[in-house]
């Protein structure tokens, strides 16, 4: 009997000590956990701050100052497009319509096109003088649009239409085209293009260089030979500065002939040299036609050529007068209609 109380006291003491020890261990583990958590929280905050900074910088690269999405800047197109095919066999469908051509060129709008895959090296305006040649125009547009697109050009096509039945003035129409096209875009290069000539080889680049370019080396109607050694007609390319330097074309060539030789003389007067592509590249098909009424041969062209050196400063872009009747933007081209009411 005397031994029982000490036994029970010792057992309870053991339980108390065991319970105290357990509390101590749990407390120690818990305190270590919270200390570690406190140390981790600042690191987590630093990580999230860095993450948000990266996201913000990424957004700055794709958003403009006004919050609008910015497209990444395109690389320049190559000087020679990888899309070129070379010589093509041209086919002219007798029942071809403008609507068919529009369907084949869905990325052309208001006569304008630019490549989406790269930044074009030049902005090129194609100027086509026109009157009563609707079928020729359709055929040219059918082939010219894909031709220029394969060259990866930023281009616009302008048809300059002379109204009325008075004598046709190709050169003055081209001066008008130059002046009016520059109201819409600061074009780098101008291609002066007859409506009845269709290029056959897309390596014949419709771009401008250090010197004026004559692109028609040969055509089917001449056996693909140059018409004469100093021929500078049909299709020519001059930069904005080159054409301005020579004061453009003369305005005084009414009817057919002489204006292209006059331009050549102006180019030579300014010590510029005419360049041409290789004969197998500068090939064109001329669509057959008879002489238009109102475009008879200019019998006074030789006299005008003789006085070019005296009058070029006052006869050209600087004196090109006309009445602008309309500027209409069709899907495939811009149509500029003018009246030369002072025509003789």
UniProtKB/Swiss-Prot annotation:
Cofactor(s), names only, from the UniProt record: Mn(2+)
One Gene Ontology term, aspect cellular component: extracellular region
GO biological process: carbohydrate metabolic process; keratan sulfate proteoglycan biosynthetic process; lactosylceramide biosynthetic process; protein glycosylation
Positions of glycan attachment: 220, 335
Keywords attached to this entry: Disulfide bond, Glycoprotein, Glycosyltransferase, Golgi apparatus, Lipid metabolism, Manganese, Membrane, Metal-binding, Secreted, Signal-anchor, Transferase, Transmembrane, Transmembrane helix
Enzyme Commission number(s): 2.4.1.-, 2.4.1.275, 2.4.1.90
CDD domains in the cross-refs: b4GalT
Main enzyme class: transferase
Protein's UniProt keywords contain Nucleotide-binding: no
Purpose of the protein: Galactose (Gal) transferase involved in the synthesis of terminal N-acetyllactosamine (LacNac) unit present on glycan chains of glycoproteins and glycosphingolipids. Catalyzes the transfer of Gal residue via a beta1->4 linkage from UDP-Gal to the non-reducing terminal N-acetyl glucosamine 6-O-sulfate (6-O-sulfoGlcNAc) in the linearly growing chain of both N- and O-linked keratan sulfate proteoglycans.
The family this protein is said to belong to: Belongs to the glycosyltransferase 7 family.
The protein, known as: Beta-1,4-galactosyltransferase 4
Native organism taxonomy: Eukaryota, Metazoa, Chordata, Craniata, Vertebrata
